Amino acid sequence: MPKILVSAGEASGDLYASLVVQELRRIMPDAEFFGCTGPRLRAAGVRTIVDSADLAVVGLIEVVAHIPRIYGEFRKLLRAAREERPLLAILTDSPDFHLRVARKLHRQEVPVVYLVAPQAWAWRRGRVREMRRTIRRLLCIFPFEEEFFRRYGVPATYIGHPLAGLVHPALSREEFFKKHRLAAERPLVSVLPGSRRGEAARHIPALLDAVDRIYREQAVNVVLPASATTGVAFFQERMGNSPIRVIEGESWDAMAHSDLALAASGTVTVEAALLGTPMVTFYKVTGVSWLAGKFLVDIPFYSMVNLIAGRAVVPELMQSQMTGENLAREALRLLQGGRDREEMKAGLAQVKEKLAGRTGAPGRAALAIQEILEGQVTHVS
């Protein structure tokens, strides 16, 4: 029975890796999977060695504070790899953790497939040297990444975005509004503060202020879909008298039926783009992390939507710009409709076209992994 180590450090990676595992089970039904898991990987039958919730930390300074715990999980995962001797490892996202894991696995002669490329094109470009040495195949989910990494000698393949063709609502707008007792005549705003508790806690105060300001100007429905990694109670404890309705999951339904999303920069903005939902993006880290990042990051935009488009399609309110006043101003402008909203929707449609033009990413990833296991490493077309 072949064993495969699978590791995902955050919610999006947990989803992407679980889709690949499901495809692998179809072509390798006798394979056994173990590793660092979130709820989706566990649901896909991957045996847990480390819980990915213990790795969900963002920001340079924030990571430093959690190094002892993260190092303990790192050692636990590598100990399992030594004992179980997997034929291959699939590492997903979370590069600060997984590139170190890749280095150790390379020494154990375990082939490493890396799913979701580290953003070396944006910062810390020196990481490509380590990747070239330790990674057997890099599976890229954005169209511009393959060329960048191949230029540096990393064996990269663009497989398409795992969410392309997958993101869609389960309920109609009428069903969603009825289920959550929303006023049918009011616009719907989704609040998406991030899938990690640390980042969500930093964003909540400004978002609460923004919603209060919006509510004073326009009657709206507001929902906050809580991810499995944060939980409903985490947000309910922080809502006070806010009109925000916290719901469990259902983020795709919420975004699909929203007139606007207030979205933390990350995977959720790609999901909103695939659903065609206008949005205002934001993000905030600690002051020290922000200053350090300003010296290290070399990209024109922070939002992946704008990076894919190659232009400013959605507003970006980063760090000190992320205030309730600024969020509310941008939100009200877009809720009013008109030219700005239509131009954004046209830009989002172009982003969707770029991503949705290559569906079936999990299947292509599974075939690439199968080829490596069979010793037939070829370019996946």
Swiss-Prot record:
The record ties this protein, via SUPFAM superfamilies, to: UDP-Glycosyltransferase/glycogen phosphorylase (SSF53756)
Record-linked Gene3D superfamilies: Glycogen Phosphorylase B
- Mind listing the UniProt keywords for this protein, alphabetically? Glycosyltransferase, Lipid A biosynthesis, Lipid biosynthesis, Lipid metabolism, Transferase
Task: Identify the metabolic or biological route this protein is part of.
Answer: Bacterial outer membrane biogenesis; LPS lipid A biosynthesis
- What GO terms in the biological process aspect are recorded for it? lipid A biosynthetic process
Q: Name one GO cellular component term.
A: membrane
EC number from the UniProt entry: 2.4.1.182
Disulfides per UniProt: none
GO molecular function annotations of the record: lipid-A-disaccharide synthase activity; phospholipid binding
Catalysed reaction(s) here are: a lipid X + a UDP-2-N,3-O-bis[(3R)-3-hydroxyacyl]-alpha-D-glucosamine = a lipid A disaccharide + UDP + H(+)
Which superkingdom is the protein from?
Bacteria
What is stated as this protein's family in its record? Belongs to the LpxB family.
Q: According to its UniProt entry, what is the function of this protein?
A: Condensation of UDP-2,3-diacylglucosamine and 2,3-diacylglucosamine-1-phosphate to form lipid A disaccharide, a precursor of lipid A, a phosphorylated glycolipid that anchors the lipopolysaccharide to the outer membrane of the cell.
Q: What is this protein called?
A: Lipid-A-disaccharide synthase
- Gene name linked to the record: lpxB
